[in-house]
Amino acid sequence: MAIHYETKATNVGGRKGHVYTDDRALDIDIVPPAQADGKATNPEQLFAAGYASCFNGAFDLILKQNKVRDAHPEVTLTVRLEDDPDSESPQLSVSIDATIKNVISQEEAEKYLQMAHEFCPYSKATQGNINVDLNVNVVD
């Protein structure tokens, strides 16, 4: 299997600590969500940022492969840390809310969103592990 990309991140101190990537492009304090102060982030925000970016890249690619131009996709990804009825530890769930310009029908937009979900590496990694809700709105 060919590796397309590899990166490393190191954390010291867990959810009340610090995380940095090997190239230091990301070098930031980590705090639990309840202690958010606007100067640090938390694992859920990092996951949301990575997944939203990856998913929107996949969505844009699928649209272009299907000759949909000027759709200008935008993806907002919500990560929730919620009770797990089967465990004492919490679980994650995700909502993916995409918006595209009115260049295709709602039905086509939903089809391409599903195709992006099947293509996106983050979606593949979470498949069967967390609940993921998909939504797309076609706007003027």
From Swiss-Prot:
It holds the Pfam family OsmC. Gene3D superfamilies: 2.20.25.10, 3.30.300.20. GO terms for biological process: response to oxidative stress. Belongs to the OsmC/Ohr family. NCBIfam families: organ_hyd_perox. This is Organic hydroperoxide resistance protein-like. It comes from Staphylococcus aureus (strain bovine RF122 / ET3-1).
